[in-house]
């Protein structure tokens, strides 16, 4: 999928780029796999803001994606490649031999008419989903399970892929896109190939309005707020924050403070952090 540019008939249009959607084969989703999506604008069930800078955006419906890929031994034909407004990756509609339909993440290179399959006996080719125990070492994979049967949780965004580095005993070692080296049980499943829509990172939004269409509201600096709104606020002009270091709106240290729990159970599965350092046990 390529990137298209626009004629600069307005200043914001000058640097704007977008996807040409050349891989998309239909604009109408499968009705049986679409549900309504309610907007919460970052509020919880009490109406309190739990996530700032969310609200508005274009209306969208949620496409039910099969991240588990548990239908083993039955081949499926790729019917369409579709746009999904809820994620950066494109999705593929597949139809199994028994008539069941499902959406999966569309890997790079997957074409309409190709067949995909799930299970330990599946062929080693792009789009097939297998346990890590059956995938050759060195393969590029995505949609990786952290726990067997839970469904893919890792490496699902556009253009991403992880590499299967080694297998030892009950665990496989993966190199994630961030550079982190992590162990995952070999009974967990993963899909072969790289997630499609690889040019997504080259898109330049170009103007604030496109960000608002995505449901993202403006982020305001604390230093320009009033002191009752933020610890950095107040003062005449560009006054300093008056603290040893920056803090969050709730007074917690920001920028550089480690937030991961030191006694988290999954720490033992991380062999190397994304910054190249060993994780302190």
Swiss-Prot record:
GO terms for biological process: cytoplasmic translation. The keyword Nucleus does not apply. Signal peptide: none annotated. One of its GO terms (molecular function) is structural constituent of ribosome. Keywords: Ribonucleoprotein, Ribosomal protein, RNA-binding, rRNA-binding. Pfam families: Ribosomal_L2, Ribosomal_L2_C. The keyword Ribosomal protein applies. Residues 220-281 are annotated as: Disordered. SMART domains: Ribosomal_L2 (SM01383), Ribosomal_L2_C (SM01382). InterPro entries: NA-bd_OB-fold, Rib_uL2_dom2, Ribosomal_uL2, Ribosomal_uL2_bac/org-type, Ribosomal_uL2_C, Ribosomal_uL2_CS, Ribosomal_uL2_dom3, Ribosomal_uL2_RNA-bd_dom. Coiled coil: none annotated. Residues 272-281 have a biased composition (Basic and acidic residues). It comes from the Bacteria. GO terms for cellular component: large ribosomal subunit. Residues 258-271 have a biased composition (Basic residues). SUPFAM superfamilies: Nucleic acid-binding proteins (SSF50249), Translation proteins SH3-like domain (SSF50104). One of the primary rRNA binding proteins. Required for association of the 30S and 50S subunits to form the 70S ribosome, for tRNA binding and peptide bond formation. It has been suggested to have peptidyltransferase activity; this is somewhat controversial. Makes several contacts with the 16S rRNA in the 70S ribosome. Belongs to the universal ribosomal protein uL2 family. Part of the 50S ribosomal subunit. Forms a bridge to the 30S subunit in the 70S ribosome. This is Large ribosomal subunit protein uL2.
């Amino acid at each position: 999928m390529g990137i298209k540019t626009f004629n600069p008939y307005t200043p914001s249009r000058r640097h704007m780029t977008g996807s040409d959607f050349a891989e998309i084969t239909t604009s109408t989703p499968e009705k049986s796999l679409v549900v309504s999506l309610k907007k919460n604008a970052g509020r919880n069930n009490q109406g309190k803001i739990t996530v700032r800078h969310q609200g508005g955006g274009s209306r969208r419906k949620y496409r039910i994606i099969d991240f588990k890929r548990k239908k083993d031994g039955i081949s499926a034909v790729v019917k369409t490649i579709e746009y999904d407004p809820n994620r950066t990756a494109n999705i593929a509609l597949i139809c199994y031999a028994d008539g069941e339909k499902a959406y999966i993440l569309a890997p790079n290179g997957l074409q309409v008419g190709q067949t995909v399959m799930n299970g330990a006996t599946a062929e080693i080719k792009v789009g097939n989903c297998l346990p890590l125990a059956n995938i050759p070492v060195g393969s590029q994979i995505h949609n990786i399970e952290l726990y067997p049967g839970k469904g893919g949780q890792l490496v699902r965004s556009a253009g991403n892929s992880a590499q299967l580095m080694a297998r030892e005993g009950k665990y496989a070692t993966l190199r994630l896109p961030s550079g982190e080296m992590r162990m995952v049980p070999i009974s967990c499943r993963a899909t072969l190939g790289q997630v499609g829509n690889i040019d997504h990172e080259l898109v330049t939004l170009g103007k604030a309005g496109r960000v608002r269409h995505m449901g993202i509201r403006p982020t305001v600096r604390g230093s320009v707020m009033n002191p009752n709104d933020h610890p950095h606020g107040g003062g005449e002009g560009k006054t300093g924050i008056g603290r040893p270091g920056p803090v969050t709106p709730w007074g917690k240290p920001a920028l550089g403070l480690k937030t991961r729990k030191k006694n988290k159970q999954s720490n033992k599965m991380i062999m190397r952090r994304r910054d190249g350092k060993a994780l302190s046990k």
